[in-house]
Amino acid sequence: VPLEPVYPGDNATPEQMAHYAAELRRYINMLTRPRY
């Protein structure tokens, strides 16, 4: 199971937020992907 990405904080840089958003999206995709 992939680890949940850590929220970088309210004063994170846009780059950090973008990276977090991408990691979070991938994490959710891993969780919701059907197991065949």
From Swiss-Prot:
Compartments reported by the entry: Secreted
GO biological process: feeding behavior; neuropeptide signaling pathway
Residues found modified as Tyrosine amide: 36
Gene3D superfamilies, alphabetized: 6.10.250.900
Predominant place of localization: secreted
Keywords: Amidation, Hormone, Secreted
Classification via SMART domains: PAH
Gene name of the encoded protein: PPY
Name of the molecule in the record: Pancreatic polypeptide
GO cellular component: extracellular space
Family (UniProt): Belongs to the NPY family.
Coiled coil region boundaries: none
Keyword Secreted: yes
UniProt superkingdom: Eukaryota
Entry-linked PANTHER family: NEUROPEPTIDE Y/PANCREATIC HORMONE/PEPTIDE YY (PTHR10533), PANCREATIC POLYPEPTIDE PROHORMONE (PTHR10533:SF2)
Pfam annotation, one family: Hormone_3
